[in-house]
């Protein structure tokens, strides 16, 4: 009989512990200073050296986050194919720009700097005006900066002391870009 009471008591204690764990709040809140929150929400490859939250969201939506860490060029090719096929829209186009720049910064491959500029330009000036970026979209300013920085790095002189504006055929990860440039057109 004592053994039965012991089992009952042990079962009761187990049930109370289980009930207490089930009633615990699974989510908590921690106070964070506003400037820390702002830096986290507005951080990008240009400001903190990591892709922005919108770009990370695209990687997760496409199940490419892990692949980008392991095989960035393959992940970029997959995302490029999704955009070209029409399965993904402007969010992925922006992500391609930022991720191409991020990869270029790590590898110093000019083709990826130029790709960042091409994707940023396509995001800023879409063929379909109904997909023009909202002037209040924080990605708009970042895309303009990615365009400028991508062009500057892609066309930098060998010693990177200046930008060498010139005509030519430039390699891209997904093809090539033909550029015609006439110095007489400069002001």
What are these model-derived regions, one by one?
Residues 1-12:
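Bacterial N-terminal signal peptides that target proteins for export
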Residues 24-106, 110-182:
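N-terminal alpha-helical interaction modules that lie
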Residues 19-22:
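C-terminal motif of bacterial Sec signal peptides marking the signal peptidase cleavage site
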Residues 14-17:
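Processing junctions and N-termini across compartments
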Residues 183-187:
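Extended, non-transmembrane interaction/recognition domains
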């Amino acid at each position: 009989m004592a053994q039965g009471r012991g089992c009952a008591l042990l079962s009761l204690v187990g049930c109370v512990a289980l009930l207490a764990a089930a009633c615990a709040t699974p989510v908590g809140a921690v106070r964070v200073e506003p400037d820390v929150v702002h830096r986290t929400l507005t951080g990008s490859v240009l400001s903190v050296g990591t892709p922005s939250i919108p770009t990370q969201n695209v990687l997760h939506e496409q199940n490419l986050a892990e692949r980008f860490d392991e095989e960035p060029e393959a992940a970029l090719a997959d995302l490029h194919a999704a955009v070209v096929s029409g399965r993904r829209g402007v969010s992925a186009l922006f992500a391609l720009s930022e991720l191409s720049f991020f990869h270029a910064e790590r590898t110093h491959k000019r083709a990826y700097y130029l790709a960042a500029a091409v994707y940023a330009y396509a995001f800023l000036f879409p063929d379909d005006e109904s997909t023009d970026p909202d002037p209040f979209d924080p990605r708009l300013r970042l895309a303009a900066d990615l365009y400028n920085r991508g062009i500057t790095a892609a066309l930098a002189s060998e010693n990177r002391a200046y930008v060498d504006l010139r005509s030519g055929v430039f390699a891209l990860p997904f093809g090539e870009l033909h550029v015609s440039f006439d110095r007489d057109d400069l002001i």
